[in-house]
Structures are given as C-alpha cells and as structure tokens.
Swiss-Prot record:
<keyword id="KW-0067">ATP-binding</keyword>
<comment type="subunit">
    <text>Heterotrimer of A, B and C subunits.</text>
</comment>
<keyword id="KW-0436">Ligase</keyword>
<keyword id="KW-0648">Protein biosynthesis</keyword>
<dbReference type="GO" id="GO:0070681">
    <property type="term" value="P:glutaminyl-tRNAGln biosynthesis via transamidation"/>
</dbReference>
<dbReference type="GO" id="GO:0006450">
    <property type="term" value="P:regulation of translational fidelity"/>
</dbReference>
<dbReference type="GO" id="GO:0050567">
    <property type="term" value="F:glutaminyl-tRNA synthase (glutamine-hydrolyzing) activity"/>
</dbReference>
<dbReference type="InterPro" id="IPR003837">
    <property type="entry name" value="GatC"/>
</dbReference>
<comment type="similarity">
    <text>Belongs to the GatC family.</text>
</comment>
<keyword id="KW-0547">Nucleotide-binding</keyword>
<dbReference type="InterPro" id="IPR036113">
    <property type="entry name" value="Asp/Glu-ADT_sf_sub_c"/>
</dbReference>
<dbReference type="GO" id="GO:0006412">
    <property type="term" value="P:translation"/>
</dbReference>
<dbReference type="GO" id="GO:0050566">
    <property type="term" value="F:asparaginyl-tRNA synthase (glutamine-hydrolyzing) activity"/>
</dbReference>
<dbReference type="GO" id="GO:0005524">
    <property type="term" value="F:ATP binding"/>
</dbReference>
<comment type="function">
    <text>Allows the formation of correctly charged Asn-tRNA(Asn) or Gln-tRNA(Gln) through the transamidation of misacylated Asp-tRNA(Asn) or Glu-tRNA(Gln) in organisms which lack either or both of asparaginyl-tRNA or glutaminyl-tRNA synthetases. The reaction takes place in the presence of glutamine and ATP through an activated phospho-Asp-tRNA(Asn) or phospho-Glu-tRNA(Gln).</text>
</comment>
<dbReference type="Pfam" id="PF02686">
    <property type="entry name" value="GatC"/>
</dbReference>
<protein>
    <recommendedName>
        <fullName>Aspartyl/glutamyl-tRNA(Asn/Gln) amidotransferase subunit C</fullName>
        <ecNumber>6.3.5.-</ecNumber>
    </recommendedName>
</protein>
Length: 99
C-alpha cells in the first residue's frame, strides 16, 4: 500500500502537526515502510497459535498478572491534595490545543 502526500497531510492535521515539505516527504517514506512491514506480518501463518493477552518475557507466565479485585476509589479531596491548581472539585490545567 502506497501512502499519498494528501494522506500524510490529513494525518498531520488530525495530530495538529505543522510539517515542512521535507518532513512530509520523509513521513511518506517512513509510513510506507511501516505499512509494508505490517502487510508482511499479516502474511504470517498463525494457524494453530493460541491468542495471547500479553507479550511474554523472561519470567513466569503469570509474573505481571494479579487478581482483579475492587478497591475503594481515591476521594476528591485526596486527589486534589497535590494538584498545582484546582477549583470546584476539578483539576485546572493549561490549554494545550488551539483550534
């Protein structure tokens, strides 16, 4: 699958990125490579391979798994205790998206 310059610009717009012409060309090449790699992965025969819920590593299979048990939620006052700014029971944060 070949990605077009128009598609790169569209994705950049969704991510609110301002790319130069050189960056757009480089992204086009990079994204083509990623999509080509994904296409090759899709060709791998996984028949008979059991689905996994997580990637295994050099440890016991259940090393990162624990029972899922409910705990009481953190209270509003405790949650706001270390917030640099808060008001009316909400965190106050600086505006990060301008559109």
């Amino acid at each position: 699958m070949k990605i077009t310059e128009k598609e790169v610009r569209y994705v950049a717009g969704l991510a609110n990125l301002n790319l130069t012409e050189q960056e757009i060309a480089r992204m086009q090449v990079d994204l083509d490579g990623i999509l080509e790699h994904m296409a090759r992965l899709n060709e791998i025969d996984t028949e008979g391979v059991a689905p996994m819920s997580q990637v295994l590593f050099e440890a016991e299979e259940t090393a990162t798994l624990r029972p899922d048990s409910p705990i009481p939620p953190l209270g509003n006052q405790a949650a706001m205790a270390n917030a640099p700014q808060s008001g009316a029971g909400y965190f106050k944060v600086p505006k990060v998206i301008e559109r």
